[in-house]
Every structure is written in structure tokens, then in C-alpha cells.
Amino acid sequence: MPKLKTRKAAAKRFRATGSGNKIFRRKAYKNHLLYHKSAERKRRRLSGLALVSEEDIKEVRLMLPYL
């Protein structure tokens, strides 16, 4: 049986925790068009990592078989 391929675009966007139970992602809307967003919004709501929701974990695991 051949090896499963990893979706490289997804591999750059998701990371697993040490135990592998949870998957992290970056928050959206912080790449461009930032001048009209307040510093508070960028710092508090858009910074840091977020967990992938339970509903989406199955799809992420299909894209990343060796995660």
C-alpha cells in the first residue's frame, strides 16, 4: 500500500499539541488591511493561537495523516 500524502498547504497552517489530541491554528484577519483595525482588536482578539473546533478536526486529520 502506498504512503498517504500530506496536504502541504494544511501542514503549514496547523500544529498538534504534545499529546496529539488537539490541533492549533492561527486566527484569521491579521495579514493585511490592518490600518483600520484598532490595536486592541489586533492584540487581544487576533493574536495568539486558537484550537480547531471539534467539528473540523476530522477534516484536518484527513489532510494531515501523519500529524
Swiss-Prot record:
This protein's GO CC annotations: cytosolic large ribosomal subunit
Keyword annotations from UniProtKB, A to Z: Ribonucleoprotein, Ribosomal protein
Top-rank taxon, per record: Bacteria
Keyword Ribosomal protein set for record: yes
Record PROSITE patterns: RIBOSOMAL_L35
InterPro entries: Ribosomal_bL35 (IPR001706), Ribosomal_bL35-like (IPR021137), Ribosomal_bL35_CS (IPR018265), Ribosomal_bL35_sf (IPR037229)
Gene3D superfamilies: 4.10.410.60
Name of the molecule in the record: Large ribosomal subunit protein bL35
